[in-house]
From Swiss-Prot:
Site feature (Contributes to redox potential value) residues: 51-52, 171-172
Keyword Kinase attributed: no
Name under which the protein is recorded: Protein disulfide-isomerase erp38
UniProt site (Lowers pKa of C-terminal Cys of second active site): 237
Cysteines joined through disulfide linkages: 50-53, 170-173
Site, as annotated: Lowers pKa of C-terminal Cys of first active site: 116
Domain Thioredoxin: start-end pairs: 19-130, 131-251
Motif (Prevents secretion from ER): 366-369
EC number: 5.3.4.1
Keyword terms: Disulfide bond, Endoplasmic reticulum, Isomerase, Redox-active center, Repeat, Signal, Stress response
Any one GO CC term of the record: endoplasmic reticulum
Length: 369
């Protein structure tokens, strides 16, 4: 009976160990797993009797689980440095727990000196590897985590970049965090906009904070496309305030939550021409004028949307009621929901353009009622 009980306990222990997402390291596998694998690895040197190690254990396991989807890009591992003292000595471990980051290219690790909470550890991994932890029950963050080594590569190019310089202990930063996540999600479909964050209190972020004049937290800076000189953001910190700011600066037409406003995709010069048609002008004359106007457009985005104006005019030449029917059809599809964000954007732009063709008729119908 005692033997059976021992076997059951051993089996349960083995099952628990098998489920762990944290890699166990010993002298015989350390070099192969950490130094020769080419994969960045965070290693905890711990002792079973250490109270701080016991407190860290569930957080460390959660970190490993949140990164398990990217195990080909980053590893979370641990060493019982009380049992394997040679390994601890090899890497200068003098207390427990000690966390060291190996970049997969060098035998010289970087000491982790941040907090032992999940957010701090996750942010550290994101800064070092670009891999973001997937927290249980939530989608991966769309905020771009930057540091001293990566911020230069993120600004000055073909993107407008909005950066929040924060500190883990800052209460206002914690209040901003969920709004910042929403903002990143709102602009996720806009390739020319990046929503980013720098832990300006971390050793890997202090240089950037000093360079860009950060003296308090949070500090928000806007780097326009093609510029490495930031503009200070001093407006409100609600999603609506931040969305409005980015729309004005980047020429986007987002609404809080990620939708597009009623102007998105429309072109003022073509709207004036369409107004002549809805006002009673000849369709053939309007279509010809629109084609000439399109030739003068130089913005690539405008040219893309201009094609749809011309397509609608062509359809109208074959069916007078096309714009009204297509407007109603696309609005119905949008109301049903269940579409991918890119498809929602595409249909919203078409509805906005079609509205220019039908709004005169809609106004007249209201007047008759």
């Amino acid at each position: 009976m005692v033997l059976l009980k021992s076997l059951v306990v051993a089996s349960l222990a083995a099952a628990v160990a098998a489920k762990s997402a944290v890699l166990d390291l010993i002298p015989s596998n350390f070099d192969d797993v950490v130094l020769k694998s080419g994969k960045p690895t965070l290693v905890e040197f711990f002792a079973p009797w250490c109270g701080h190690c016991k407190n860290l254990a569930p957080v460390y396991e959660e970190l490993a689980t949140a990164l398990e989807y990217a195990k080909d890009k980053v590893q979370i591992a641990k060493v019982d440095a009380d049992a394997e003292r040679a390994l601890g000595k090899r890497f200068g471990v003098q207390g427990f727990p000690t966390l060291k980051f190996f970049d997969g290219k060098s035998e010289q690790p970087v000491d982790y000196k941040g907090g032992r909470d999940l957010d701090s550890l996750s942010n550290f991994i994101a800064e070092k590897t670009g891999v973001k932890a997937r927290k249980k029950g939530s989608a991966p963050s769309l905020v771009n985590i930057l540091n001293d080594a990566t911020i230069k590569g993120a600004i000055g190019g073909d993107k407008n970049v909005l950066v929040a310089f924060t500190a883990p202990w800052c209460g206002h930063c914690k209040n901003l965090a969920p709004t910042w996540e929403k903002l990143a999600a709102t602009f996720a479909s806009d390739p020319e906009i990046t929503i980013a964050k720098v832990d300006a209190d971390a050793p890997t972020g202090k240089k950037s904070a000093a360079e860009y004049g950060v003296s308090g937290f949070p500090t928000i800076k806007f780097f326009p496309k093609g510029s490495t000189t930031p503009e200070d953001y001093n407006g409100g910190r609600s999603e609506a305030d931040l969305v409005k700011f980015l729309n004005e600066k980047a020429g986007t037409h987002r609404t809080p939550g990620g939708g597009l406003d009623t102007v998105a995709g429309t072109i003022a010069a073509l709207d004036e021409i369409v107004a002549k048609y809805t006002g009673g002008a000849s369709l053939a004359e309007v279509a010809e004028e629109a084609k000439e106007a399109v030739k003068s457009l130089k913005n690539s985005a405008e040219l893309k949307y201009a094609d749809y104006y011309l397509r609608v005019l062509d359809k109208l030449s074959k069916s007078e009621g096309y714009a009204t029917k297509e407007f109603a059809r696309l609005e119905g599809i949008l109301k049903k929901g269940g579409l991918a964000p890119a498809k929602v954007d595409e249909l919203t732009v078409k509805v906005n353009v079609l509205r220019k063709f039908v709004e005169k008729a809609a106004e007249e119908a209201k007047e008759e009622l």
